[in-house]
Design a protein with these regions (language model features):
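Conserved active-site-proximal phosphate/metal-binding subdomains
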Residues: 1-12, 16, 22-159
Length: 159
């Protein structure tokens, strides 16, 4: 959110806020900072309609607010994921100077493996709001909750 007002001021087009949007309050905050809309990803990993394995979904649901890490620093293709022994080892090697080509070889197909349920050698991509995901739900229920939280937040500021 720190860069959102800067982007809004710097460009002459609608701005969509993304990253860290996990509640109706965050949607209201993005709007206050000048965004005309938001993109939400991680929350919908818990949706029944999301085509991921139950193992992937459960890892996101079980994640706490400090349970994500960023890998891909050496390649310029940074990815935030739920921490795992596989990714912790990869990140440690990366910080020691792992060759980017070796990194790419070790991670080739890891996202697909996670989606298929092979989470031990998979990359369970999820944002920092993973800790706010508490249970499996429907996409409609997630949207309904976000709308209610947003409306409640806006009403507080209008009174």
């Amino acid at each position: 959110m720190a860069t959102l007002p800067q982007v809004v001021q710097a460009v002459d087009m609608p701005v969509i806020a993304a990253g860290g949007i996990g509640s109706g309050q965050a949607i209201a905050a993005a709007e206050c900072l000048g965004a005309c809309g938001v993109q939400i990803g991680t929350l919908f990993l818990a949706a029944e309609e999301c085509a991921i394995s139950e193992a992937y979904r459960q890892q996101v649901i079980d994640a706490g607010d400090q349970d994500t890490i960023v890998t891909g620093i050496s390649t310029g293709g940074r990815v935030r994921s739920v921490a795992s022994p596989f990714l912790a080892e990869l990140l440690a090697d990366e910080l020691k100077g792992l060759d980017p080509k070796v990194f790419l070889e070790r991670t080739q197909g890891s996202y697909g493996r996670a989606i298929a349920g092979e989470i031990d050698q998979g990359t369970i991509q999820a944002g920092e709001v993973a800790g706010q995901v508490k249970a499996k739900s429907t996409a409609k229920a997630i949207i309904d909750r976000l709308v209610a939280e947003y409306q409640e937040t806006v009403a507080k500021f209008q009174s």
